[in-house]
Swiss-Prot record:
Motif HBM3 mapped to chain: 322-327
HBM2 (motif): residue ranges: 248-256
Species the sequence originates in: Encephalitozoon intestinalis (Microsporidian parasite)
Organism superkingdom: Eukaryota
Disulfide bonds, paired cysteine numbers: none
Compartments, record wording: Spore wall; Spore, Perispore
Name this polypeptide is given: Spore wall and anchoring disk complex protein EnP1
């Protein structure tokens, strides 16, 4: 009985602490328990008496879902549960049900570098200690979300969140922009005699293209110098001028006929504005890609892939939203290969 009383007291002490969310980087997204240990946190013990406070916390911080490592007296660090902000509690599944946060009750430092879109949280009626987290902290620093859930009558709401400050400059204006990863399409070709006992040889061919638009020249004249780097077993470079009317002007070498540009790249002005708008929204540099279907994707940080979906019903050309790609869809997208799209001055 004494042991039971001590356990009840311990759980009561834990529940009395402030709920905090630990943001998980890519290395910890599937191992939330390791993130809690490495950050010297105490895992939050969820039960029937505090689940409503946890739900109010998620809504106050605008967090869709978070890992829970303890439910009542059950240790779930091997197979955690995922608590959604609508109140649903479901088992963890690495393909269909993951989270970017884990609930804890101790002051913790977020483990590892990470990059994520910074959004000012909306207050849904809970008392928030820091309504607007700082924006534009960079890719190597992060701030743990902190909120105080007050079960007492709610005080008047604080002033609306001010918009995130714009990023210092876009990636195309920096002298040293980060190098984007490449995602070549890998094909296997069989060669050798079709008949006979000799084995067939398999040749692996990597196909990759990167389109670079000289936006500096575009600002001066309206024309854009385009450089296409193709990597099919060996590097091949093409360079031509794309006029503001969409016409391709060939160089001095008349024998060189540039390949036609994909339709989504024929108006680099709008594409450049789209990328700048995305970078201003997430307060971070992004890498832009297209696939063979001319669909546009961006990579934020080192592991967050998003599909850019344009809102055609709205009149503004810059109206878009980002749809995260993960799991089997992401693996299939990378397997089929992606073409890089960059905006920077051409040195040659």
């Amino acid at each position: 009985m004494k042991l039971l009383g001590l356990l009840i007291s311990a759980f009561g002490a834990i529940n009395a602490l402030k709920i905090k969310a630990l943001y998980l980087s890519c290395d910890y997204e599937l191992r939330p328990y390791n993130a809690v240990i490495d950050s010297q946190c105490m895992a939050f013990a969820l039960n029937g008496s505090n689940i409503h406070e946890a739900i109010r916390y998620l809504n106050a911080m605008n967090i869709d879902k978070a890992y829970v490592l303890y439910w009542n007296d059950h240790d779930l660090h091997q197979n955690p549960m995922v608590l959604h902000k609508n109140g649903a509690l479901a088992p963890f599944d690495r393909y269909t049900n993951t989270a970017k946060h884990v609930l804890c009750v101790e002051a913790c430092s977020c483990p590892g570098p990470q990059s994520r879109p910074v959004v000012c949280p909306e207050n849904n009626g809970a008392s928030v200690s820091s309504p607007c987290p700082p924006c534009g902290q960079g890719n190597n620093t992060t701030v743990c979300d902190k909120v105080v859930v007050n079960p007492q009558p709610v005080k008047p709401l604080p002033a609306p969140c001010t918009p995130c400050a714009p990023c210092e400059s876009s990636s195309s204006e920096k002298s040293e922009s980060k190098e984007c990863m490449t995602f070549p399409r890998i094909c296997k070709k069989k060669c050798g005699p079709r008949h006979g006992r000799s084995p067939k040889k398999v040749e692996i061919v990597k196909s990759q293209k990167t389109y670079t638009f000289d936006i500096e020249r575009y600002k001066r004249r309206g024309d854009v110098v385009v450089r296409v780097c193709s990597q099919d077993c060996k590097d091949k470079f093409e360079k031509f001028v794309l006029t503001k009317t969409g016409e391709i002007r060939k160089g001095k070498d008349k024998k060189c006929i540039p390949e036609p540009l994909p339709e989504c790249l024929q108006c680099p002005k709008n594409l450049y504005k789209l990328k700048s708008g995305i970078e201003a929204k997430v307060c971070s540099e992004v890498c832009m890609y297209i696939n063979s279907k001319c669909e546009i994707f961006v990579l934020i940080g080192d592991c967050d892939f998003y599909k850019v979906v344009m809102n055609e019903r709205r009149r503004k050309q810059s109206s878009f939203h980002l749809k995260k790609i993960r799991g089997q869809k992401l693996r299939e997208l990378i397997r089929q290969g992606l073409f890089g799209v960059e905006f920077s001055p051409l040195k040659c």
